Amino acid sequence: MAQPERKHALPRGTVLRDSYRIESILGAGGFALTYLGSHTGLDQKVAIKEYMPDQFAVREADRATVRPRADAGDDYKHGLRRFAEEARTLAKFRHPGIVPVTDIFEENGTAYMVMEYVEGESLHQHLGRVGTLDEPGFRAIFDPILAALAEVHANGILHRDIKPANIYVRADGSPVLLDFGNSREALGTKAQSLTVAL
């Protein structure tokens, strides 16, 4: 599979918070970049998501600092707050069907979310490889995902973007739900015009 390219991505070897080294880019969306990283002290792979909204920000010449575009400062700040809120919300969950968030921090004028690196493939890729699922195969993936969603819903959060690309099948066959960027608290908040895609 070809590696995603993104002209605003942090260079390989960049060290964040004196602990996390950028190894490569895993994915790029309109609001965030996801990197394969390593925790330099623990010698562990991690996934690092960086808030980097193309329409609201640019990367400075130092190839690290993120600066809001002149006409988008308020939108950038709003999205940054949402990104941090989503990370803090996800960090509360301890469920095998939800990827653990282990750290969040601000640096370079933006925010970063550190998560367990999940080895495997998206359900979309999995279905392309194995074809149609029989009932036991379907239940092996969706029973744990439904249990994860029940946990999320019990805490007043709606995922709002369930699709094969956002369900990852680990190397051991267990599924995990990714990308809570379109999630929203079900009660007690008004609709926001900006949704941060984590």
Task: Tell me the role of every PLM-derived stretch.
Residues A147-I157:
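Protein kinase catalytic-loop region centered on the HRD/HxD motif
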Residues N108-S122, H126:
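Conserved short submotifs of the Hanks-type protein kinase catalytic core
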Residues I104:
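Activation-segment/catalytic-loop signature of the eukaryotic protein kinase fold
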Residues I141-F142:
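Activation segment signature within eukaryotic-like protein kinase domains
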Residues E23-G29, T34:
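Protein kinase glycine-rich loop
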Residues E60-K92:
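AlphaC helix of the eukaryotic protein kinase fold
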Residues S38-K45, M52-F56:
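Conserved N-lobe loop of protein kinases adjacent to the ATP-binding glycine-rich P-loop
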